Regions:
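Interdomain hinge and pocket-entrance segments immediately C-terminal to HTH DNA-binding domains
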Residues: 82-101, 115-119, 162-163
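Hydrophobic hinge/microswitch elements
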Residues: 127-131, 146, 199-253, 284
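C-terminal effector-binding regulatory domain of bacterial HTH transcription factors
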Residues: 192, 229-238, 247-299
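Short helix-boundary/capping micro-motifs
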Residues: 10-28
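Hydrophobic/proline-rich hinge and linker segments of small-molecule sensing/allosteric domains
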Residues: 153-195, 253-260
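A short LG(V/I)-centered, amphipathic sequence patch enriched
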Residues: 40-57
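Secondary-structure junction motif
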Residues: 177-205, 209-215, 281-288
């Protein structure tokens, strides 16, 4: 079976639409339809039911989903195995949001290379949608993200709780969105909580889908936005940014996702190191919080 057909099938499943699937894999909608039709002819069954609400799997489609994932992952694993660089024993592809590469995954990377020097690592940055697709297809071994989706054959594990604080270039910043406020799109859950806390917020002049982009704009031009505390901590210490004390703090969990089929020592070892870095990071944050509280009591 052509793995391209299986990949197209999985993309339609993930997106819930032939149109969206075509956009994701950069082909026409008719090409997606033709590939699915060819696949259905080869399997001798109908895989999707299309209606106004989108595309839904049939019973046969749900059965084939597991096999399609296995097929694509097997091919990708074969590419990994035959493509191991000389001098290394194995390869590892790790993908994460750019905000999670900052501080957290970069610390993990240094520890991983020290602990497993014979593993060739490919580091990638992407948003959740692309990371999940890479995991389903087997192109990515480990994904680190904020809002993973439930997929057959994938394990999702909580790493740590991200704290999003309203940080401003002004020491007396407003406790709600005002002039110069940059809305960072941290995902649908953040949007829902943000809307509930700030019901009168009409909308931002600037929206950034990546925290790093919004942060650079604020530092360059002034303003405020909700950013991960662990990332802005050095900027808070240097007084380039200030936490708006009366503003709400949003908690956002960070997860590690990997295939249940991958039980290789280096994959499990990489995840164990991620747990260790997350634990150390959480402990450091708790210690900083305790110091601040002690300082407030003294003053």
């Amino acid at each position: 079976m052509d793995t391209e057909l299986a990949r197209t099938f999985l993309t339609v499943v993930a997106s819930g639409s032939f149109v969206t699937a075509a956009e994701r894999i950069h082909v026409s909608q008719s090409t997606v339809s033709t590939r699915i039709q060819t696949l259905e002819e080869q399997l001798g069954c109908i895989l999707f039911v299309r209606n106004k609400a989108g595309t839904a799997l049939t019973a046969a489609g749900r059965q084939f989903q597991r096999h399609a994932s296995t097929l694509v992952r097997t091919v990708e694993q074969a590419k990994h195995d035959v493509g191991i660089p000389k001098g290394f024993s194995d390869t590892l592809v790790v993908g994460g949001r750019i905000g999670l590469w900052e501080e957290y995954l970069l610390h993990w990377l240094a520890r991983m290379q020290a602990a497993h020097p014979r593993i060739s690592i490919r580091a990638e940055s992407a948003l959740e949608q692309e990371l999940m697709q890479g995991l389903v297809e087997g192109r990515i071994d480990i994904g680190v993200m904020y809002t993973p989706q439930s997929r057959p054959g994938l394990k999702v594990e909580l790493l740590f709780e991200e704290q999003l604080v309203l940080a401003s270039t002004s020491p007396g910043g407003m406790a709600e969105p005002g002039p110069g406020y940059v809305y960072v799109d941290w995902g649908p859950e953040f949007y829902a909580r943000h809307s509930a806390v700030f019901p009168n917020f009409a909308g931002p002049a600037l929206t950034a889908n990546i925290g790093w982009l919004g942060l650079q704009h604020v530092l360059e031009n002034g303003g405020a936005g909700f950013f991960a505390r662990r990332i802005v901590e050095p900027l808070l210490r240097s007084k380039r940014l200030h936490v708006v004390s009366d503003a709400p703090v949003f908690s956002m969990p960070a997860y590690v996702v990997h295939s249940l089929d991958r039980q290789d020592d280096h994959v499990l070892g990489a995840i164990e190191i991620m747990r260790g870095v997350a634990a150390a990071q959480t402990m450091g944050a708790d210690e900083r919080k305790a110091r601040v509280q002690r300082t407030r009591k003294i003053s």
